[in-house]
Amino acid sequence: MALRNKAFHQLRQLFQQHTARWQHELPDLTKPQYAVMRAIADKPGIEQVALIEAAVSTKATLAEMLARMENRGLVRREHDPADKRRRFVWLTAEGEKILAAAIPIGDSVDEEFLGRLSGEEQELFMQLVRKMMNA
C-alpha cells in the first residue's frame, strides 16, 4: 500500500495543514499555548501540573511554556504558601484580552477543517478519535 494511502500519514498531513492555517491566523499564539489559556480560563487558579494534559506536553516543557507566557504578561503563577512545590496559574488581564480575541479565530480555523464533514460525519469522526485514544 502506498504511503499516501496510510491512515496515519494522512492524519499527519491533515494536522500539518491545520497547524499551518493556525499559524497564519494566530501567529503569536501556538496551539498548546491556546489550549493552556483555555484551560486556565475555565478554571482560574488551576494547579500547574493539571495543565499538562491541556498542553499535551511534559512537565518540563509546560513549565518552560508558562515561563515564556509569564514573561509576555499573559499568565501569572503563584506558589502555594503551604507547599512551595505547588504552583497555581491565572490569566492576566492581557492574557484574557488575547484569549478573547483568539477564541473566534481558533474556532474558525477548526470549523474550516471540520466543516468539510457533515454534522453526522463530524460526530462519527469524534467517536472514532476518542475510541482510538482510549483503546
Swiss-Prot record:
Residues 4-134 form the HTH marR-type domain. PROSITE patterns: HTH_MARR_1, HTH_MARR_2. This is Transcriptional regulator HosA. Disulfide bonds: none annotated. The keyword Transcription regulation applies. It comes from Escherichia coli O111:H-. The gene is hosA. Involved in the temperature-dependent positive control of flagellum-driven swimming motility and cellular aggregation. Regulates fliC expression by directly interacting with fliC promoter. One of its GO terms (molecular function) is DNA-binding transcription factor activity. It comes from the Bacteria. Residues 48-71 bind DNA. Keywords: DNA-binding, Transcription, Transcription regulation, Virulence.
